[in-house]
Amino acid sequence: MAEHRFEDFNGLVMYRKNYKEKDMLVKILTDRFGKKMFYLRGANKPKFRLSAAILPFTQAEYGGDIRDDGLSFLNNVKSATQFQTISQDLFLNAYATYILNLIDVGFPDSEPLGIWYDKVEQALNLIDEGFDAAMITHIIEIQLLQVFGVQPQLQGCAVCGRTDLAFDYSESYGGLLCQRHWHLDPNRFHSSQRAIYYLRLFSVIDLFKIQSVNVKEATQVELKMIIDRLYQDTVGLSLKSKQFIDKMYSFDSQLPQLKKVPSEIDSTPKDD
């Protein structure tokens, strides 16, 4: 018989789905127990008492019956707040969903995530406050590569370790090559130094110390191409939320009514 205990915990609603006629399954990223699926009987009934606490993109202090195996159960909520900006903006919604999907795929259920719970919470806070959703998502993507077991060498040259020369990315060498060793891989990415700079920066930047971000559009486009290629070739993920972002990215100019007002993100380092 599975062990269970009544616990208080903080959590972020990852997603929810209807179950049977009037019930619901809600997956919550918790600060203490990792990702847990909760069964809420009667959640689809009118005036369900926990309705506000199980909305998408909600963070709350919960109390519940935590089961080691199988479904857990929510009993009460002490406080709940929703990421309002994310909830009301299709673009931000897509990026936040993608971040949560990456976490769902990257970590087993019922295992504490440690610092990653705080990272995800802070990433959503930054996006909700108006920081560039694509750049915050790229930071998460790059730092998650280690979780997926494919962390590239981004601190120095993968061959000689030098850190003071121009760099390019090499899939064959699993990281950066300094200019002296570019000849070793004719299929290197041929990336700009500005894009490589941000790739390296995003791999170590502390989300809690970001005050602003300002990356030129051309660099953003190149960064997206680099990170997409890393995920396609080394991680091998094909998430629906990422496909949706790519479609938005491609057809952004055709959807002016959905475009977000440019965010106020000046950068922690400036992109001169």
UniProtKB/Swiss-Prot annotation:
- Mention one GO biological process in which this protein takes part, according to its record: double-strand break repair
Which domain of life does the protein's organism represent? Bacteria
Query: Membrane-crossing residues?
Result: none
InterPro entries documented for this protein: ARFGAP/RecO, DNA_rep/recomb_RecO_N, NA-bd_OB-fold, RecO, RecO_C
The record's disulfide annotation reads none
Q: Which UniProt keywords apply?
A: DNA damage, DNA recombination, DNA repair
> Pfam families annotated for this entry?
RecO_C (PF02565), RecO_N (PF11967)
What GO cellular-component annotations does this UniProt entry give?
Answer: bacterial nucleoid
Q: What does this protein do?
A: Involved in DNA repair and RecF pathway recombination.
Q: HAMAP family, per this entry?
A: RecO
Protein family membership: Belongs to the RecO family.
The entry's protein name is DNA repair protein RecO
